[in-house]
Design a protein with these regions (language model features):
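Residue-level signature of mid-helix packing/kink "hotspots" within the transmembrane helices
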Residues: 47, 75-84, 134, 168-169
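Small-residue (Gly/Pro/Ala) motifs that create kinks and tight helix-helix packing interfaces
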Residues: 53, 167-176
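Conserved MFS/SLC helix-loop-helix module at the cytosolic interface between two early adjacent transmembrane helices
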Residues: 81-120
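Helix-breaking motifs and short loop linkers at transmembrane-helix boundaries and internal kinks
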Residues: 61, 94, 115-121, 132, ...
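Extracellular/periplasmic helix-loop-helix junction of adjacent transmembrane segments
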Residues: 50-81
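Membrane-interface helix termini in secondary transporters
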Residues: 55, 84-88, 177
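Cytosolic juxtamembrane N-terminal segment immediately preceding the first transmembrane helix
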Residues: 2-38, 42-44
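Cytoplasmic helix-loop-helix junction between adjacent transmembrane helices
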Residues: 125-164
């Protein structure tokens, strides 16, 4: 019961975050659809450079080792370590705001990837793609978990994570593989 004496549609889980106890609305599914779309775009941004190695090497004077560092280390290092920091912020703060900031960071970094003039600028741009994308999954799963009851949250989380595979497939198509 809430302060008004009416039954509350939200209850706190053991982490203190509210958990949904109501039937799902169309808006809840709209949120999942938007997170799915963001997941697709995020994964395209993440992997498409791997499919464009030859055109990038033709444009920029990069060695195989530098291409490997740009497509692997640059993204992964900040994705992994940033994910820990950003995940903690998401648990303590406003998930939608943090997700929005992460999307802006990785979108700007993706644009910077396209205008990079050499190894250093490309490496830095890919690092920022990694730090931006590090917040996507923790924020999205938290947002979905708040909107759906514990007994029904599996389907929307599965839909969200399916976006990774759809994005990977689209990256292959867009990258010409």
């Amino acid at each position: 019961m809430g302060l008004t004496g009416k039954a509350s549609a939200m209850t706190a889980d053991k982490t203190g975050w509210p958990r949904c106890q109501k039937a799902q609305s169309r808006y809840d599914w709209y949120v999942v659809a938007m997170l799915f779309a963001v997941s697709v775009l995020g994964y395209i941004d993440r992997v498409i450079l791997s499919f464009l190695v030859e055109p990038v090497k033709a444009e920029l004077p990069l060695s195989d080792a530098q291409i490997g560092a740009v497509t692997g280390l640059a993204f992964a290092a900040l994705y992994v370590f940033g994910g820990i920091f950003i995940g903690r912020m998401i648990d303590q703060g406003r998930r939608v705001l943090i997700l929005t900031v992460c999307i802006v960071i990785w979108s700007l970094a993706t644009g910077a990837t396209g205008i990079a003039t050499g190894f250093v600028t490309l490496f830095i741009a890919r690092m920022f793609v990694g730090i931006g994308e590090a917040g996507l999954s923790p924020a999205a799963i938290g947002i979905i978990s708040n909107r759906f009851a514990a007994t029904t949250v599996q389907k929307p989380i599965s839909l969200f994570t399916t976006g990774l595979y759809v994005g990977g497939g689209l990256a292959m198509i867009l990258g010409g593989q």
